[in-house]
A protein has these predicted regions:
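Conserved class I S-adenosyl-L-methionine
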Residues: 1-3, 42
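Extended basic-aromatic, gly/pro-enriched interface segments that bind polyanionic ligands
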Residues: 18-120, 124, 128, 136, ...
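A short glycine-rich, Lys/Arg-flanked "PGG" loop and its adjoining helix->strand segment in the class I
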Residues: 138-150
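Conserved beta-strand signature within the Rossmann-like core of class I S-adenosyl-L-methionine
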Residues: 150-158
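Core SAM-dependent methyltransferase catalytic element
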Residues: 164-182
C-alpha cells in the first residue's frame, strides 16, 4: 500500500496519547512523546512504487476527500501541511514531520517466511489473507508470529481467517479480531 493505513494508525495513536495526557501537542499536529517512549510504525509492500509514494507522504485531495484516506476525521488534517493548490482548486497535502519521524517503509514480500523485523507489539495484516490459499496463509501467519514479541497481538480483518490457530489466543471485540501470541 502507499502509506495511508500506516500513517492513519500513527495519527490515531498520537491523537489518543494526547487525549490520555501521555503526549503533548505543542502546536497543531506537532506532538511530542515522553523521552522514554518510542513509537515506530513499519509499513511494507512488495511494490517499489508503493514504497516510494509512502515515503514521499504527499497526497492529493479529490472531491470525495483526501486521496484514499477514507472516512478521515477532519480534525486529523492538523497532521498535514498544505503544499500546493493548483488552478483547478486541487490541493496537495504532505504529512507533517512530527508524524513521519515515527514511520519507516520497506520492501517486503509477505510470502517471505522471515519477518522484516522482530519484537513488534502489534502486527496489522488486514484484508490480505483472503486473497490467498491456505498454505500461503500459513507461511504469512507464522512469519507474523515470529515478528511479534511474547504477548504481542496480530490484528486481522473479520474476513481474514486464522490459518494457524494454535499459535495465538483469539480475542474478538466488536468489528476487530485480535490474536495474542502464545
Amino acid at each position: 500500500a502507499t502509506g495511508e493505513e500506516a500513517y492513519t494508525l500513527t495519527m490515531l495513536t498520537l491523537n489518543t496519547l494526547v487525549r490520555l495526557g501521555v503526549a503533548h501537542e505543542a502546536t497543531r499536529g506537532n506532538i511530542t512523546l515522553p523521552a522514554d517512549w518510542k513509537l515506530e510504525v513499519l509499513g511494507t509492500d512488495i511494490s517499489r512504487q508503493a514504497i516510494r509514494i509512502a515515503r514521499e507522504a504527499t497526497y492529493i485531495e479529490r472531491r470525495e476527500g483526501l486521496s484514499s484516506f477514507r472516512q478521515f476525521p477532519p480534525a486529523y488534517l492538523r497532521f498535514f501541511d498544505l503544499v500546493n493548490c493548483d488552478d483547478n482548486d486541487r490541493k496537495t497535502w504532505q504529512i507533517k514531520e512530527s508524524v513521519r519521524r515515527h514511520m519507516r517503509f520497506d520492501l517486503h514480500n509477505l510470502m517471505n517466511p522471515l519477518p522484516p523485523q522482530r519484537d513488534f507489539d502489534v502486527n496489522f495484516c488486514r484484508n490480505a489473507l483472503i486473497y490467498m490459499d491456505q498454505e500461503p496463509q500459513k507461511i504469512i501467519v507464522r512469519a507474523l508470529h515470529q515478528a511479534l514479541q511474547h504477548g504481542g497481538c496480530l490484528v486481522l480483518s473479520l474476513v481474514d481467517t486464522m490459518a494457524v490457530p494454535n499459535l495465538y489466543h483469539e480475542n474478538r471485540q466488536n468489528k476487530c479480531v485480535l490474536y495474542e501470541k502464545r
